[in-house]
Amino acid sequence: MPILLLERPQNASGTAKKYWLFSMSKEEKLLRACEEVKNLTYTQGAYTIFKVWEPKERLIMALPFYDRVVQHMIVNIIGPVFEQGFYYHSYACREGKGMHAASEQLSQWMYELMIKEGLRLYGFKGDIHKYFASIPHDKLKEENRRYIGDKKALYLMDGIIDKNGILPDGVGIPVGNLTSQLFANVYGNKLDKFVKHTLHAKYYIRYMDDFIILSADLEQLKEWRKRIEEFLEKEMELQINPKSTILYAGNGIDFCGYIHHPEYKKVRKASVRKLKKNVKQLEAGELERVEFEKKYQSRLGHMGHADTYHLTKAIEYELLFWEWEQTESGIAIPA
């Protein structure tokens, strides 16, 4: 059984409190988890269900802390087996990948193709409709069996898949679970193989349920879109989001939080609006300085991966001017 590194959360949120409760009898619970996995007696606990609205409305089903530890243990064991078969340019929830790496790769491809093809560059921006909630259990289990032959591991995986909270029987995996992230990548790899090995699309990148295909051939992209829609429906029992579209790359491609152009990259207008709103809230006294700094640094970190020099400087100057006004008025500014 691989060693599980149980790291302390870096904040005082509910997760941190659950960590401390767990750590009070950590050794005993880890031994129990190992035994349950080994003896196939692990039974998943009940979900806590809530919604989040950033970046869009999603239903989250969170497991008890103990179950998260057990499933982390399971993923540590089976994850590397799956990883060997994943498409290289699938970037979600994988070590060494992530949103910024996906964004950088798309930018690189767009620049390369602009040099090769001039202005004749198009992109198919695809999105799988309600991906996590629509994955069929029977087909997901089939995909798992293409990678894993161990019957004990498959038994545990099947049990986790079947216990899907308030979703309909036989369909859907909960957003938020570590195992769900892995299973979603496993199932998405079926699409990756089709696009790469059947359609032979060279410039194809995916981040979970969002994907981009670049080409200088507009008619080819239209044909690929049609075949992908058919493949998703017939082979994967999924639907493409009606908002999926083919667009001229020179107008920008929205992917992983950025608007990508062949020669530069911008942040989404919504991100800029949120930052400016936070600044106005600070100036109006509606947002505490400490809370503002958390949001501000987070958004600056995001903007730092795009061409936003003039934007960030403008906001810095506005904040400096506000601080100067506060000082002139004799109002103390919290550190």
Residue spans of the language-model regions?
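A generic secondary-structure signal for well-formed alpha-helical elements
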Residues: 77, 81-85, 144-152, 164, ...
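Conserved two-metal-ion catalytic palm core of "right-hand" nucleic acid polymerases
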Residues: 1-140, 165, 335
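Right-hand nucleic-acid polymerase module
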Residues: 72, 163, 168-169, 222-223, ...
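Conserved polymerase palm-domain catalytic core
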Residues: 29-32, 36-37, 89, 104-208, ...
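Helical (often loop-to-helix) elements that flank the catalytic cores of nucleotide-handling enzymes
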Residues: 218-239, 268
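A generic structural signal for residues located within well-ordered alpha-helices
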Residues: 65-69, 179, 183, 251
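Surface-exposed helix-capping loop/turn segments at secondary-structure junctions
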Residues: 84, 197-203, 236-240
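Short, glycine-/Ser/Thr-/acidic-enriched flexible segments
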Residues: 67, 218-219, 260-261
